[in-house]
Amino acid sequence: MKKQWIVGTALLMLMTGNAWADGEPPTENILKDQFKKQYHGILKLDAITLKNLDAKGNQATWSAEGDVSSSDDLYTWVGQLADYELLEQTWTKDKPVKFSAMLTSKGTPASGWSVNFYSFQAAASDRGRVVDDIKTNNKYLIVNSEDFNYRFSQLESALNTQKNSIPALEKEVKALDKQMVAAQKAADAYWGKDANGKQMTREDAFKKIHQQRDEFNKQNDSEAFAVKYDKEVYQPAIAACHKQSEECYEVPIQQKRDFDINEQRRQTFLQSQKLSRKLQDDWVTLEKGQYPLTMKVSEINSKKVAILMKIDDINQANERWKKDTEQLRRNGVIK
């Protein structure tokens, strides 16, 4: 977990008021332990010299000078550069830093001590935090590190190289456009032409195939068959029957009419269904033949889109880099 410390009012959180008894200050170990607690283990006291300013009973006020250091390298955020976080190293682990402070003590060697540091001032920044992944994550740039200028120039050079690649990428896009036009033309031509020589679409080809079923159903219309049967078969049969006998028995003739009409309907339905299945299979076969042509168009388009996205990413990265570097220079973070 990253820790943040800021010297200021937080230093007043611990007990104030402290002391000096028998002319003795708190021991160095007590001072170091209290300092470590007060600064959450981030800072540690290395050396200290006390000067008594006031003493009353078991309480005393002291001025302090000496050396402190950090338990880890500490950093503070100073800006953003594209996808990189710019940090300044404010403290170096175990490197002594001069400090001055005030402290109060309360107690005696026999009773023990309570100590509070305040008015802390160090010859280093009063800000900093531990960055756990500083050595494993490349997203950080340390502005006061020895390799900052090198890393900055390397990143800038890589962006310039990408930007210079845009003309070649745009040339690839134009070549793909030509390929896609040719591929689309082949895919469209696959459906053939109609009787008037006009290029058909997929919908046109679908209608043309299934037109055979529509024509079959039209030619074998059951209602038309019934009308024709009544006129050409049933009525003449009834007339002939009555001509042979005034007491013509019409039932067999009517039954045959009903059977023939129903049978025609049944056969028409069965043949229409059979034809529909055949035409559907024909359509599936036709579509399978066209599928590779459509996929070719799609593959070319996917390549084109990928290149266009790459160009867009390069432009955005360069624009962001330019904007961020200008802002960082205005703020004095980089030169």
Curated annotation (Swiss-Prot):
InterPro entries: DUF1202. Pfam families: DUF1202. This is Uncharacterized protein YggM. The lineage of its organism: Bacteria, Pseudomonadati, Pseudomonadota, Gammaproteobacteria, Enterobacterales. The gene is yggM.
